[in-house]
């Protein structure tokens, strides 16, 4: 059993002897871990980390069963938020002003199930955060909810978070995407997943951005094809381009697949800033594959889009693309002419934001 297994086991048990023994015993009984011919313990994939061992589940059920029914309901709603939750969100979902008091009392008990983990403000309102003392408490409470209850509570939690953070400059877009996704509400889930992915791009959290934006694309695939749907997909895939190239390289299969789909969408849609950014992304992928002619052709398309929109930033990208492609192809005079024009119209104050969108430094080098 490698270090990754041991770290994961510890994260689920916190080193608690009973939990550790029962977790490992359950894996042995399910043959999730078994001895190899060499006598070493090995794992099968995927491991059922979320399956609570029977004896542990019985202990948790006994502890929770001793709580007042109102507090049990509070904690069940809290479990929908995850291991850490906000008391005010639970109170709003339950429409019960007594939630905060019950959680405060429970957090002070000797054998408490939750503990305070901080406070922050949502506008002028104070919000209190709690954490389940162990992830297994949260998993047990969430696991005993019916499928209908999960859908309902995820929707209520999502709409409550929307209301609490309305007008906020930094809403919890990751949480909102998760709750609407789990509630089966595809359109708001896509909206918030796109925002969460774009925020991850700005933070250079490329692997996280890829994970979130791929999920947005998967959800979009469930919707009927319309021009509005295509525009949203184009926006998602443009946001994906930079992180995919950062994680897997310019010519990775995922980046190429994303690029092919972008090409289809660009051909369908009218000129726009997003179409221009998509074409620019195509030039990056083509250029690293030494496809000089194709790079020049797509860059000229980008120049045409920029002219139709009278968009200086897109014109910089298009001229640079044509200029570099012509230079690589040995047509130095033509290449210099385009590069010179791009250099002259480049405005760092106007064009600097593109690096956050494309994952590329934009402008003269």
Language model regions located:
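Short, intrinsically disordered, charge-balanced linker/junction segments flanking boundaries
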Residues: 358-365
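Short secondary-structure boundary elements
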Residues: 2-211, 215-224
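Inter-helical turn/loop elements of alpha-helical hairpins
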Residues: 97, 140-347, 351-354
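A general secondary-structure signal for short beta-strands and their flanking turns/coil
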Residues: 125, 231-233, 359
């Amino acid at each position: 059993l490698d270090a990754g297994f041991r770290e994961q086991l510890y994260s689920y048990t916190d080193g608690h002897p009973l939990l550790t023994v029962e977790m490992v015993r359950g894996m042995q009984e399910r043959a999730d871990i078994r001895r190899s011919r060499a006598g070493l313990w090995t794992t099968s994939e995927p491991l059922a980390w979320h399956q609570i061992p029977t004896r542990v589940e019985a202990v948790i059920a006994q502890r929770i069963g001793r709580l007042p029914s109102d507090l049990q309901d509070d904690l069940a709603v809290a479990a929908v938020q995850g291991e850490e939750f906000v008391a005010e969100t639970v109170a709003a979902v339950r429409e019960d002003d007594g939630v905060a008091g019950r959680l405060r009392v429970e957090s002070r008990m000797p054998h408490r199930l939750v503990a305070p983990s901080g406070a922050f403000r949502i506008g002028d309102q104070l919000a209190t955060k709690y954490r389940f003392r162990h992830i297994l408490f949260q998993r047990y409470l969430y696991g005993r909810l019916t499928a209908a209850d999960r859908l309902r509570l995820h929707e209520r939690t999502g709409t409550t978070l929307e209301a609490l953070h309305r007008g906020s400059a930094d809403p919890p877009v990751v949480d909102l995407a998760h709750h609407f996704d789990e509630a089966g509400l595809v359109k708001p889930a896509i909206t918030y997943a796109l925002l969460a992915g774009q925020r991850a791009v700005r933070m250079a959290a490329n692997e996280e951005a890829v994970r979130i934006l791929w999920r947005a694309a998967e959800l979009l695939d469930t919707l009927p094809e319309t021009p509005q749907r295509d525009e949203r997909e184009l926006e998602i895939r443009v946001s994906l381009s930079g992180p995919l190239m950062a994680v897997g390289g310019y010519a990775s299969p995922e980046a190429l697949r994303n690029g092919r789909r972008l090409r289809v969408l660009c051909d369908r849609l009218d000129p726009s800033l997003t179409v221009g950014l998509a074409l620019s992304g195509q030039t990056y992928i083509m250029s690293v594959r030494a496809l000089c002619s194709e790079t020049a052709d797509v860059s000229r398309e980008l120049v045409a889009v920029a002219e139709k929109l009278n968009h200086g930033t897109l014109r910089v990208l298009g001229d640079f693309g044509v200029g570099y492609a012509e230079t690589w192809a040995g047509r130095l005079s033509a290449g210099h002419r385009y590069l010179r024009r791009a250099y002259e119209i480049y405005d760092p104050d106007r064009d600097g934001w593109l690096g956050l969108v494309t994952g590329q430094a934009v402008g003269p080098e």
